[in-house]
């Protein structure tokens, strides 16, 4: 199964675009108090050699990279939860720095898909008080629509799926935060951004069309992401380690 590609002349981001986007996000200081949880799903049925030891001793790079770039973009309240370390994690009960989480980012490989679905469903149990739910990782990149209308009730699913790398997430956050009023829940700002059509201009996203209904959902795919050419634009990979949730039940 091969993913589509952009034209050779349009594969990469313009040099400097990544760092410029992080700098613009640093200027949006009203958003820096958002509580962001990055959850890495893990299915314990997949624990087997040769990964028996490494799976519980190594923090995956993907979620650490997200924390690195969010920290470099000015966000202060970040936490990475690894389900292999904290198997009973429930987003609906999660509190970060004394407050419920505002954004839940779920990352999963294909073999860990089922627990990732349950993380999304659990967050949706909060109803109107639920966080903005974003899905990503290999599972989401290849089968993004599996995260929409997951049931058992209508409307249960992720708000948006990133089918690209970290820059796609930065562009999404920037677009939503520009539409966000002071003190407004970020999920409300996302809904308004989605209805405005702004998200259609960000390659690498999949979300439900605002004109679709729960009984006939229609997904919008904004196209193939652009890739980062100069990896020196990435921040130092240290903040991700500092915001790891320690192992506990």
Regions found by a protein language model. Name each.
Residues 1-20:
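Helix-enriched interaction subdomains in cytosolic or periplasmic regions
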Residues 69, 77-224:
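Glycine-rich beta-alpha loop elements in corrinoid/cobalamin-binding modules
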Residues 17, 58, 62, 112-115, ...:
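Soluble or luminal CAZymes and related metallo-dependent hydrolases
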Residues 16-56:
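Short glycine-rich His-centered loop
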Residues 58, 216-219, 229-249:
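Radical SAM [4Fe-4S] cluster-binding motif and immediate context
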Residues 37-42, 70, 78-79:
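Eukaryote-specific, low-hydrophobicity, charge-rich regions
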Residues 55-71:
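Short catalytic helix/loop segments, enriched in acidic residues and glycine
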């Amino acid at each position: 199964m091969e993913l589509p590609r952009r034209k050779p002349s349009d594969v990469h981001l313009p040099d400097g675009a990544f760092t410029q986007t992080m700098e613009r996000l640093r200027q949006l200081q009203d958003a820096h108090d958002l509580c962001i949880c990055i959850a890495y799903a893990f299915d314990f049925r997949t624990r087997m050699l040769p990964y028996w030891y490494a799976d519980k001793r190594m923090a995956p790079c993907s979620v650490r990279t997200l924390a690195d770039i969010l920290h470099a973009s000015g966000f202060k309240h970040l936490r990475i939860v690894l389900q292999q370390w904290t198997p009973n994690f429930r987003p609906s009960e999660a509190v970060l720095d004394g407050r419920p989480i505002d954004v839940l980012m779920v990352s999963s490989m294909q073999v860990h898909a089922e627990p990732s679905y349950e993380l999304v469903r659990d967050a949706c149990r909060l109803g109107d008080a639920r966080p903005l739910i974003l899905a990503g990782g290999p599972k989401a990149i290849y089968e993004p629509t599996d995260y929409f209308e997951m049931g058992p009730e209508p409307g249960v699913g992720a708000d948006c799926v990133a089918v690209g790398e970290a820059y796609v997430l930065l562009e999404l956050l920037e677009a939503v935060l520009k539409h966000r009023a002071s003190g407004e829940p970020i999920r409300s700002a996302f809904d308004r951004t989605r209805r405005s059509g702004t998200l259609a201009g960000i390659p690498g996203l999949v979300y439900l069309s605002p004109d679709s209904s729960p009984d006939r959902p229609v997904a919008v795919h904004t196209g193939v992401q652009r890739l980062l050419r100069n990896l020196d634009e990435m921040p130092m990979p240290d903040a991700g380690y500092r915001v790891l949730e320690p192992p506990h039940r």
